[in-house]
């Protein structure tokens, strides 16, 4: 998805919890940053010049309590803090290998934040196992949040 956004003319910052994955992010022509969704401050430190935040953790791996937290209280805390940043939208991945109840709770938190704080959000339920359809759904969510056609598109 990051490559698709870069191709469309956007600057994209990719994050990883594992510094060893930074080279893969750089190889996709993205800015690479180490940040941990279990530590909201590490995410918030990166959003000063960001238009959209993508919470692409539908297939996250880790300890069950950490997975529950990043789709629950950590996500909720992040949404509360995003209100005071320049971020103009949030995309939540509500599909993947994570237990459905966690994804449903995360989607609920994101929708509640949209209602409470008027944060524009998109909840994407496309299966990441279908890479092309998932990528298209993510790009469509991006367009909905920023309005208008994809950057760099003819027309």
Question: Which residues make up each language-model segment?
Answer:
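N-terminal Rossmann NAD(P)H-binding glycine-rich loop of SDR-like oxidoreductase domains
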Residues: 1-10
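NAD(P)H-binding glycine-rich loop region in Rossmannoid oxidoreductase-like domains
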Residues: 14, 19-76, 81
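Conserved beta-strand segments of alpha/beta enzyme cores
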Residues: 11, 31, 120-123
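Alpha-helical elements of Rossmann-like donor-binding domains used by nucleotide-donor carbohydrate transfer enzymes
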Residues: 42, 77, 109, 137-141
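Short, charged/polar "capping" segments at the starts of alpha-helices
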Residues: 20-24, 98-103, 131
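Anion (oxyanion) recognition and catalysis
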Residues: 6, 26, 111, 115
